[in-house]
Each structure stands twice: as structure tokens, then as C-alpha cells.
Amino acid sequence: TYTVQVKDANNCIVKKDYTVSQPTSLYLTLSKKAVSCFGGSDGAVNSLATGGTPPYSYKWMPGNISGQKLSNLQVGTYTVTVTDFKGCTLSSAITIDQPIALSLVTGSKNEICDAPNGKAFITVSGGTAPYTYSWPSLNIQQDTASGLHAGSYTVVVKDKNQCSASSTI
């Protein structure tokens, strides 16, 4: 607080107190949405500035992109710099992740004596569990198909994010 005192030619005095305040510190909150499928580009980031003196401007790197939000992002690290009305700045980085690629390991047991007793099975890793299985030519929805004749069979696997992989056994 500062006091200003003014005295005129007639010795009249006026005093006035003034308080000079500082804005609250600039603060930045970041949130993200990871890429759904390995190698995808559907990640997103959002930034929210508070404190300082609004309005705020946002600049993202890489790409020198303006805006509070970014979408359609690939895996990587993104840095945002927020600038308030008075030119105060604050920077922060956030990393967009992705799941491990879906990996399928297949196996089979051959039919014996021309009887429909063959079996095909699959083990899945990567992606985001749980998984769904589809053997299109067999109308089977699980990780093992049994009662099979000799031949080729295709299985399609989808994870929780609808990422898919297929294999022919």
C-alpha cells in the first residue's frame, strides 16, 4: 500500500492510500487422450490456463499451432506455451502414448482320420484388453475353434479400442 499526499498553495493536504496488487500466478493444467491403436493418430491434448490476466493465447510445438486443444495427434511429446494479456508466459509438456501393437500367436491340431476333430487356437497380446474373436467362416466368437476339417481358417481379433489384427491358420 502506498500513500500519496498532496499539499496545495493554501496548505490544504489531501492523503489517499493506493494498493498495487499483483495478479495471481499463471497456472496451466494439461489433460490428454492416448492414441487408441498402435501407429494411430487419434490422440488429443487440452490445456486450461488460470491465474494471470485473461485472455490467454496458446501456442503448441511442434508445429507452431495456436489453440487451447489439439486433436488427431500421433504418439509424441507436445509442448504448449500460454501467454496472458500482460505478456506473462508459462510452458509445459505432455506426452501422448499408444498401446503396444496387437500380436497374434496361432496354433493348430490337425484332424485325424478324416474326421472333423481338428482345432485352431490363438493367443493375443498387446492392444488393450479385453479382446473379441471372430472366425468369419465358422461363426465362432472365441479364441479356439474346434471340430474342424483340414483347411485354412481366418480369425479376426479386436481389442477394447476396436483395433484389429487377423491371421490365417
Residue ranges of each PLM-predicted region?
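Proline- and Ser/Thr-rich low-complexity, intrinsically disordered segments
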Residues: 1-169
